[in-house]
Every structure is written in structure tokens, then in C-alpha cells.
UniProtKB/Swiss-Prot annotation:
This is Elongation factor Ts. Disulfide bonds: none annotated. The gene is tsf. One of its GO terms (cellular component) is cytoplasm. Belongs to the EF-Ts family. It comes from Trichormus variabilis (strain ATCC 29413 / PCC 7937).
Length: 313
């Protein structure tokens, strides 16, 4: 098979937190397939399913815009090169304006082509270039998403954590406009966004939203773990099922202990709000952005560091 590169080992280490030699062995066993290598490490008990990269390295801001009335919301990430610029008022103003303009855009390209909100003689792209010239750093709109309640009643709300490093956008549906305007319902939308920010492993609202292929992957991983290999099949199946159920709940928002009251789950909180509002209320979807997630600083020498330790030229 092809030689395992230092870059592949680096990628696997970032995704799992496993040791270098374990990562190298996993990649050899799976012929360089990173996703299969992750599962191999998990089966060996070396990698945690919830491990996130600890080498996220990009500056900038994650910000949000909620249209008055709470029917349209935006989550946006804009990157720069240093924290110094990220804290600059001109950069912050630019990001705020871009978040508002992204409410009517369907792609980064279409956003860049819009007339700029503070000067219609400029496009957004030209306004960004002017800011680059003024601040002396590259600035890029990395991504954004917008939620719009066009044919539904409900609330869109958001939460920004740690000074613009983590942001969450949440959509919540109600049966009526009166329900959407209910203070308890509006608080639920904000608290749900805060909950998602506090639970980095949560990826879905409920178990029902988890794709079948994700469930099957978890089953394959749990079934292949060595600690149950010698147990009778019926016992093994029960252990696997229990572990899968636990793992799936770790991925879902409604199954989390509520951050403001650990004695209840988020699902319990939703039920309480339904009772107070007198109608059905449901958390529909959410998106979480973590600043710089998956981006490496240009000056990082981590791959070279790995190569040196592996003896790779």
C-alpha cells in the first residue's frame, strides 16, 4: 500500500486526539482512509467519539443578525489574520453589517455582489477590500447561513459565546403568532441556542433526526470493540444496544440536561413551555459555528513536527 504521509497522521491526530504511533498504525490498517481509521481507533478504545480538534487556528468573529420580529436570522463567520484586528471596531462594524446583509443572500458570492449597506456606491466585496487596505490584513467571509420563517409561525434566535468565537442559530416553531410572541417561547429559543453552544458534541435536535447511516456506523463501532468480543452473543447484543442508545443521546439536544436546571432535560423544558404557552412548540433545527473550525494558521509547522518524529523526510 501507499506510504502513510505525515499530513494524514496530522489530520487523524487533530480529529481524534490519539497518539502519533496509534494514528500511524490505524492508517496502515485502513489503507490511509481517515474515516475508517477513526472507527478503528474507537474500536480499540483509543479515540473518543466526541473528540474535537484542539488545533483550530483562525482569527475573526462569529456574529449573528436577528431581524426585528424574530422571523429571519443569520449566523456568519468572517476571518482575519490576528486577534488584534478581530477586536478592532472597524472590523466589528463590518461583520455586523455583513450579518445583516446576509439575510437576503443565498451564497457568499451573492453577498459580495450586493451594494454595501453603508455606501451603495460600493459592493460588499469593495467595502471588504477597503477595510483590508485600512487594517492591513486579509479579511474573508468564510461562511454564513440564514433561517427564514416564510410559511411557518415561530421564532428564530441566536446566541454568541466567548466574544464571538462560538455562535448558534436556532429555529423554533409554534402553532400561532400569539404563541411565537409568548415570552416563554421566545426565552426557549434563546436558551436552546445557549444550550447548543454549551454542548459541542450535540449535532441533532432529536434521535429521530439522526441519519440511518450514522446509527449504523455507531453500531459497527460498538460491535467491533474488543472488550465484548468474548461475551455470549445475546449479552453482546444487549451491551451494544445500550451503548448505541447512550451515544445517540449524547448527539441530541433534547436529551441533554438543561444547563440552567440540571434536574430536567431540554425535552422536559420544551414540555413546560408548551404547557405555559397553551400550544405545541418545537425546536426544529440549529446550526453552530466555531471560529476557525478546521482551519490551520499558515505558520503552523505541525506537519513538519510529525514528520520529524516519524523520521519522514
Amino acid at each position: 500500500m501507499a506510504e502513510i504521509s505525515a499530513k494524514l497522521v496530522q489530520e487523524l491526530r487533530q480529529k481524534t486526539g490519539a497518539g502519533m504511533m496509534d494514528c500511524k498504525k490505524a492508517l496502515k490498517e485502513t489503507e490511509g482512509d481517515v474515516e475508517q481509521a477513526i472507527d478503528w481507533l474507537r474500536k480499540k478504545g483509543i479515540a473518543s467519539a466526541g473528540k474535537k480538534s484542539d488545533r483550530i487556528a483562525a482569527e475573526g468573529l462569529v456574529d449573528t443578525y436577528i431581524q426585528p420580529g424574530g422571523k429571519v436570522g443569520v449566523l456568519i463567520e468572517v476571518n482575519c489574520q490576528t486577534d488584534f484586528v478581530a477586536r478592532n471596531d472597524a472590523f466589528k462594524t463590518l461583520v455586523k453589517n455583513l450579518a445583516q446583509q446576509a439575510a437576503t443572500a443565498d451564497s457568499v458570492e451573492s453577498l459580495l455582489a450586493q451594494p454595501y449597506i453603508e455606501d451603495a456606491n460600493l459592493t460588499v466585496d469593495e467595502a471588504i477590500k477597503q477595510t483590508i487596505a485600512n487594517l492591513g490584513e486579509n479579511i474573508q467571509v468564510r461562511r454564513f447561513i440564514n433561517f427564514a420563517l416564510t410559511d411557518k409561525t415561530g421564532v428564530v434566535d441566536s446566541y454568541i459565546h466567548t466574544g464571538g468565537r462560538v455562535g448558534v442559530l436556532v429555529e423554533l416553531n409554534s402553532q400561532s403568532e400569539a404563541g411565537a410572541a409568548n415570552e416563554e417561547v421566545q426565552n426557549l429559543a434563546r436558551n436552546a441556542a445557549m444550550q447548543v453552544a454549551a454542548c459541542p458534541n450535540v449535532e441533532y435536535v432529536s434521535v429521530e433526526q439522526i441519519p440511518a447511516e450514522v446509527v449504523q456506523r455507531e453500531k459497527d463501532v460498538e460491535s467491533g470493540k474488543e472488550d465484548i468480543a468474548n461475551k455470549p452473543e445475546n449479552i453482546r447484543e444487549k451491551i451494544v444496544q445500550g451503548r448505541i442508545e447512550k451515544r445517540l443521546k449524547e448527539l441530541t439536544l433534547v436529551d441533554q440536561p438543561y444547563i440552567r436546571d440540571q434536574s430536567i432535560s431540554v425535552e422536559d423544558l420544551v414540555k413546560q413551555v408548551k404547557a405555559k404557552a397553551g400550544e405545541e412548540v418545537e425546536i426544529i433545527r440549529f446550526v453552530r459555528y466555531i471560529l476557525g473550525e478546521g482551519i490551520e494558521k499558515q505558520e503552523s509547522n505541525f506537519a513538519e513536527e510529525v514528520a520529524a518524529q516519524m523520521g519522514v523526510k
